[in-house]
Regions:
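Short phosphate-binding loop-to-helix
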Residues: 25-92
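Conserved core of the sugar-phosphate nucleotidyltransferase
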Residues: 78-162, 170, 177, 193-217
């Protein structure tokens, strides 16, 4: 699943540095070995303080305060490079202090993209004190009263019912079936193509339909 994720992320045209942030625990050693094998840059940090892990991973890329940071999660094998570029473009058109994200009212979970500045990430790292804010990287950012939240809403309302992230066994079954259906087109399949396939094959969409997403993301 991670290999599918990385391959699709690498299609993004506006990303010039991509680092995988994993934990320093024994259970994630296979991820480290995978990254070493694939020559994929990575950073190992705290298992519970994910905000710290993400912040130090960004530091490893020598990010400056004005640099744009994109947050993705590795449990999204069909993440869209098109949406990554679209979110970055939307962010560039506004204020760099804003929080830009793919709206899950118009897209399935599994296409999640969050965009913010390194300065905003540093502010969160230095000021977030609640356990939930340390566990969920961007929670502090988008819950601040002065946060400007800019959603990307170019999908369709009926797409949000689908679920493309892989947290449960049913999610893996759906992703496997969908990638099999996409065949050789899996690498460049657009969000529209993927969602249309799910609409055309409700038996696949139903595989994980009963799973309730844990919040916050």
């Amino acid at each position: 699943m991670l290999e599918y994720h990385l391959a699709r992320v690498h299609q993004a045209k506006l990303v010039n540095s991509h680092i995988l942030a994993t934990s320093d625990t024994e259970i994630d050693k296979p991820i480290v070995k995978f990254c070493q094998l694939k020559k994929q840059p990575f950073f190992c940090g705290s298992e519970s303080d994910v905000l710290s892990r993400f912040y130090h991973a960004a530091l490893q890329t020598k990010a400056t305060p004005d640099d744009i940071i994109v947050r993705l999660t590795g449990d999204c094998p069909l993440i869209s490079a098109t949406l990554i570029d679209e979110a970055i473009t939307k962010h560039r058109q506004g204020d760099n202090s804003q929080y830009t994200h793919i709206s899950l009212n118009y897209f399935p979970r599994g296409f999640d993209v969050e965009v913010f500045s390194m300065a905003s990430l540093t502010k969160a790292y230095q000021n977030a004190t609640k356990a939930a804010e340390r566990e969920h990287v961007t929670l502090y950012l988008y819950t601040q009263p002065d946060c400007i939240i800019v959603p990307v809403e170019t999908g369709q309302l009926d797409w949000h019912e689908f679920r493309l992230c892989v947290d449960e066994s049913e999610d893996l079954q759906l992703a496997t079936a969908l990638i099999g259906l996409l065949g050789e087109n899996w690498l460049n399949a657009s969000p529209r193509k993927i969602c249309q396939l799910l609409q055309q094959h409700p038996e696949i969409a139903q595989i994980n339909a009963k799973i309730i997403q844990r919040a916050p993301h």
